[in-house]
From Swiss-Prot:
Protein name according to UniProt: Chromatin structure-remodeling complex subunit RSC4
Stretches for region Disordered: 1-35, 536-555
PANTHER family: CHROMATIN STRUCTURE-REMODELING COMPLEX SUBUNIT RSC4, SWI/SNF-RELATED
Database matches in InterPro entries: Bromodomain (IPR001487), Bromodomain-like_sf (IPR036427), Bromodomain_CS (IPR018359), Rsc/polybromo (IPR037382)
Additional detail: Present with 8570 molecules/cell in log phase SD medium.
Residue span, Bromo domain: 53-158, 181-292
Biological processes annotated in GO: chromatin remodeling; nucleosome disassembly; transcription elongation by RNA polymerase II
Gene that this polypeptide is encoded by: RSC4
Modified residues (Phosphoserine): 199, 545
Highest taxon of source: Eukaryota
Localisation: Nucleus
Subunit description: Component of the two forms of the RSC complex composed of at least either RSC1 or RSC2, and ARP7, ARP9, LDB7, NPL6, RSC3, RSC30, RSC4, RSC58, RSC6, RSC8, RSC9, SFH1, STH1, HTL1 and probably RTT102. The complexes interact with histone and histone variant components of centromeric chromatin.
């Protein structure tokens, strides 16, 4: 039998290039293994270690998230699912004191006070052990760094679910502003922002640190880059994705930004300049997001200048039972990996996994089997509306929430977060309003020229009835006399709004206007809550053809008293309202007003028919119920 000669790759027309990085373990030749600090995080400045946070049903979230990541990134995770074989790598257990694998992490319980931080330390132990045992410039070490990065990204999304807002046009504009700020940052600007007055002097202020990260690495120049980095990213791509609406939520954008700099950490040696620049830009980006972007976003939202919205599905599940439940854990993982899972099918699976028990749900009253009512707020004062909306999803969770004391403490802590009162920054709001004030509201003194006086007082007929009731009738409870005088020559048109409060049942008033010119030359209008009110003068003019008896009935004795006998200011002739000269010159109008309970808006408008000059007086009258 003739043995055929195997064709070489070059003879078959293939390339003789071999990958630089080979899979598998590459143990170090050193006899002494470097020390591994198991209690120190890789990045102590990360918000995952700085903040005190909690994810409901954390064990279930970990298991679900790791399973999905393994399924998506099999090539990266395959070396870390199980512990190394004692048969093929016996020396591993002599050099590594605390071996760790994904299966070990999934089997542990992290639902206690320091559970989240210990979970992160166990995850980082994957790459710490790998770097201690293998050569640093090996594929397995690079993969271990990416495993830790991907897991921490998912935890970052879940941790910040309550502020992972949807990106609308206003939020997009803010993100673009801070992205451009990072792109234009120099070493001097970054140090001034991070260190303040203690920043070193004589730093470079011309070269932008972001230039090496703007575009993707060229495949022809560094083909081995794509053997290591499984998710390449560049700042220009992030900016383009943000502008075209590729990111639906804020942390989708944030994680891609962090991915740019993490890829530089993975590929380059820690002593390289680009590695240090990536660290600097990461710290500066975290500063911009945590110290400037989110506080500004919250401030704008409290002032009503921006609308912040959540993903309804994941947030409603998060709020169930104070943020607990298997549906919540599944929602967190699904939202983090929604591009790779069919949403509807997985939601059904999560519902099927819930172990409902309708016979052990304790409500108020006389039974365990009735539906929830709004009176059941004692079960959870912040979430009883959620309980009513989704009783089946929640009832199985109440039993689980009562199982341990730690769960109750976590729920109570979540409730206290819901009760947190936002701190409204009134100074910023006032500054913005002052900058946009119109000329109408400036503080320049501008006296009234057309309106000489506005006089508002109680209705005399009703007051007389209240103080002197008829024989056999019940006296009125309202016997207060009120009067308010507004002199135009002492007031400013730029401060034309006045307010006062009346006692209950004080709903009938009379308004008397005193002008500087005849009514023939001016046009007046009084509105109550945007409804026009006719004056007594107009009523009299419309009934001139009626008998004198009817005219007296229309005007009434109160009118005569108001016009002839009403005096102000101790009887000074110059301050008499409605004197005989006013009647002859026809410069006085009287309006009968009926107010409603609550806040009423009166506006008196006067316009000169010749010069078309207009003057206003606004009155806000609050009638107590």
């Amino acid at each position: 039998m003739v043995v055929k000669k195997r064709k070489l790759a070059t003879e078959a027309g293939g390339s003789d290039e071999r990958p630089k990085y080979l899979p598998g373990k590459h143990p170090k030749n050193q006899e002494k293994t470097p020390h591994v600090d198991y209690n120190a995080p890789l990045n102590p400045k990360s918000e995952l270690f700085l903040d005190d946070w909690h994810i409901p049903k954390f064990n279930r979230f970990i298991s679900f998230t790791l399973d999905v990541l393994i399924d998506k990134y099999k090539d990266i995770f395959k070396d870390f699912i199980k512990l190394p074989s004692r048969k093929f790598h016996p020396q591993y257990y002599y050099k590594i004191q605390q071996p760790m694998s994904i299966n070990e992490i999934k089997s542990r319980d992290y639902e206690y006070e320091d559970g989240p931080s210990n979970f992160l330390l166990d995850v980082e132990l994957l790459t710490k052990n790998c770097q201690a045992y293998n050569e640093y410039d090996s594929l397995i070490v690079k993969n271990s760094m990416q495993v830790v990065m991907l897991i921490e990204f998912e935890v970052l999304k879940a941790k910040n679910l309550k502020r992972n807002y949807l990106i609308n046009s206003e939020v997009k504009a803010k993100l673009l502003h801070y992205l451009n700020k990072l792109v234009d940052a120099t070493e001097k600007k970054i140090n001034q922002a991070l260190l303040g007055a203690s920043s070193p002097k004589n730093l470079d202020d011309k070269v932008k640190l972001s230039e090496p990260f703007m575009e993707l690495v060229d495949k022809d120049e560094l083909p081995e880059y794509y053997e290591i980095v499984h998710s390449p990213m560049a700042l220009s791509i992030v900016k383009q994705n943000l502008e075209i609406g590729q990111y639906s939520k804020i942390y989708d954008f944030i994680i891609d930004m962090l991915l740019v700099f993490q890829n530089a950490h993975i590929f380059n040696d820690p002593s390289a300049l680009i590695y240090k620049d990536a660290t600097t830009l990461t710290n500066y980006f975290n500063y911009l997001i945590q110290k400037e972007f989110f506080p500004e976003l919250q401030d704008l939202n409290e002032r009503g200048e921006i609308n912040l919205e959540f993903d309804k599905f994941e947030f409603e599940n998060y709020l169930a039972i104070g943020g607990g439940g298997p549906a919540a854990a599944g929602a967190l993982a699904i939202s983090a990996l929604d591009n790779d899972i069919e949403p509807e099918s997985n939601r059904e699976d999560l519902i099927d996994q819930a172990d409902y028990d309708f016979n052990h749900f304790e409500g108020l009253g006389n039974g365990y089997n009735r539906s929830l009512l709004t009176e059941d707020y004692l079960l959870n004062p912040n979430n009883f509306k959620k309980l009513i909306a989704k009783p089946e999803t929640v009832q199985s969770e109440v039993k689980n929430e009562r199982s341990t004391t730690s769960d109750i403490e976590k729920t109570n802590s979540l409730e206290s977060e819901h009760l947190k009162i936002p701190k409204y920054n009134v100074i910023k709001s006032m500054q913005k309003e002052m900058q946009s004030l119109s000329e109408q509201h400036t503080m320049e003194y501008k006296p009234y020229k057309l309106i000489q006086q506005i006089y508002i007082f109680s209705s005399k007929n009703l007051y007389s009835q209240a103080t002197k009731p008829l024989l056999g009738s019940r006296p009125s409870c309202n016997q207060n006399w009120v009067e308010y005088i507004f002199n135009g020559n002492e007031l400013s048109q730029n401060e034309n709004a006045f307010s006062f409060m009346l006692q209950p049942m004080q709903t009938f008033l009379t308004l008397q206007s005193h002008l500087t010119s005849s009514l023939k030359d001016t046009e007046t209008l009084l509105t109550i809550n945007k409804e026009p009110v006719k004056s007594r003068t107009s009523n009299v003019n419309s009934n001139l053809s009626q008998p004198q008896q009817q005219e007296n009935d229309v005007i009434g004795n109160d009118t005569k008293q108001d016009i002839e006998n009403l005096t102000i200011g101790g009887g000074n002739n110059n301050d008499i309202v409605g004197n005989d000269n006013d009647k002859r010159n026809n410069i006085t109008e009287i309006f009968d007003i009926r107010l409603s309970e609550g806040l009423n808006h009166l506006m008196f408008r006067c316009e000169d028919k010749i010069s078309h000059e207009t003057e206003f007086m606004n009155f806000w009258i609050n009638v107590l119920p």
